[in-house]
Amino acid sequence: MIIALGLVAGIVLGFITYRVILQQVPIRLMTMAEQRLLTMRNNASNIFFHGRAPTAKARQIVMPSPDLVYSSCVYDLAKGPLRMQGNLPPAGHYWSLSLYAHNTDNYFVLNDRELSDRRFDVTLHPPSSRVAENQTAVKSPSVTGIALIRMIQRREDDLAMIQASQQSTTCQPAQA
């Protein structure tokens, strides 16, 4: 009887540990990241904010690569789908869009090698929507999350080209 009770207690403790560590910790970390980014942006969601090359003192992304320039958007699909679009830097310059769910899962990635016309146009749909997913229609597993664009800056004079790409990038409600 004591062995059975110990076994049940071990299973219950294991389940609680699983729930806390593998499910709740990522959600809490993403909530903190979203709140930090929103606080820096006057609580504005669904807008891309563009950075420069990170420095040791000025960085918004955790452990950023020093040769990448980031644009980020805390998205909220509570009011419906969002359309993200813009121009990429010229061919030969790395660009990627990564979408992260509220539990930190990276559920979608698009990069410059997949976009021969150097333009991206992605509609992000809420979890409750019924949509055929492809390169331009993506269903988010959560209502909130983070969209992250990365562009490589090899030389100082690449920054003007990167900023032109950033200025063309938008995130706005999708038209029905």
Predicted features and spans:
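A compositional/structural signature for long, glycine/proline-rich flexible linkers
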Residues: 1-176
